[in-house]
Regions:
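All-alpha amphipathic helical-bundle segments outside canonical DNA-binding/catalytic cores
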Residues: 4-14, 68-81
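Acidic/histidine-enriched, glycine/proline-rich intrinsically disordered or flexible terminal extensions
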Residues: 124-139
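Amphipathic alpha-helical packing segments from all-alpha helical-bundle domains
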Residues: 47-65
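GST-like domain detector, emphasizing the conserved glutathione-binding G-site
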Residues: 1-47
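GST superfamily/GST-like fold recognition
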Residues: 73-99, 103-105, 110-113, 118-121
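Short, structured loop/turn "capping" segments at alpha-beta junctions
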Residues: 26-30, 57, 64-71
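Aromatic- and histidine-enriched alpha-helix N-cap/loop-to-helix transition segments
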Residues: 10, 24, 52, 79-85
């Protein structure tokens, strides 16, 4: 029935495409900047392949916001599935101190303003389990 996606056809198609790219791509980002909401930025530095993923993600965010984001602070204006798909990337960018352009920073702030985000962060902070050998970058 389309709920969760932008109502406008072009915005919905663009959001679905970005969601598919997020789902299937960005392997270097996923490998080198694993999600850990307890982590705080430090001197760790990733390689050029992760930099390319970071640049592509910020490009996607710029395109979506420029073409479809006039109706609100999220990628296609109002919060939608595409925003939820990129929320873990916001977490990674914050946890690793990734430099964000003004557009990416605005999107990250919009995500951080969500009650669900704050709840997610609190749950992550309360997590005590540490899996030796799988959690390469301990908080």
């Amino acid at each position: 029935d389309g709920r969760g996606w932008p109502a406008q056809v072009a915005a919905r198609a663009h959001a679905r495409s970005a969601t598919a790219e997020m789902h299937s791509g960005f392997g270097a980002l996923r490998t080198q900047l694993p999600m850990n909401m307890r982590r705080t930025p430090d001197a760790y530095r990733w390689d050029a392949s992760a930099d390319r993923d970071i640049a592509r993600i910020q490009e996607i965010w710029r395109e979506l916001r420029a073409q479809h984001g006039a109706g609100g602070p999220f990628l296609c204006g109002a919060f939608s599935i595409v925003d939820a798909m990129f929320a873990p990337v916001v977490s990674r960018f914050l946890s690793y101190g990734v430099a964000m352009d003004a557009n990416a920073q605005a999107f990250a702030e919009a995500i951080q303003s969500l009650p669900a985000w704050r709840e997610w962060c609190a749950a992550g902070a309360a997590e005590l389990e540490y899996l030796e050998g799988t959690e390469r970058f301990r908080a």
